[in-house]
């Protein structure tokens, strides 16, 4: 019983911070929205790091992209490609 309890506790201590990190660190408020060429769609809730950058690079935006909250676009972050 003790070993099961310890394993479950360890999983919770390790798993929840990882999920929380990936869910919250991917998007931020965009202060200068003029750098974005266009937003290509919403960022997945549990996207891997650099998901948006890779999507923009595959669409020939050489500066990449980032997940950002855009004014007037609702409460979900958008994948916006950078126009430099």
Curated annotation (Swiss-Prot):
A single Gene Ontology CC annotation of this entry is: extracellular region
Q: Is Disulfide bond there in the keyword field? A: yes
The principal location of this protein is secreted
Q: Where are the transmembrane segments?
A: none
Biological processes, Gene Ontology terms: defense response to fungus; killing of cells of another organism
Query: What is the annotated localization of this protein?
Result: Secreted
- The SS bond pairs are 39-81, 43-67, 52-79, 56-80
Signal sequence interval, chain numbering:
1-27
Instruction: List UniProt keywords, sorted A-Z.
Output: Antimicrobial, Disulfide bond, Fungicide, Plant defense, Secreted, Signal
Q: Which domain of life is it from?
A: Eukaryota
- Family as reported in the entry's similarity comment: Belongs to the DEFL family.
Q: What is this protein called?
A: Putative defensin-like protein 101
Originating organism: Arabidopsis thaliana
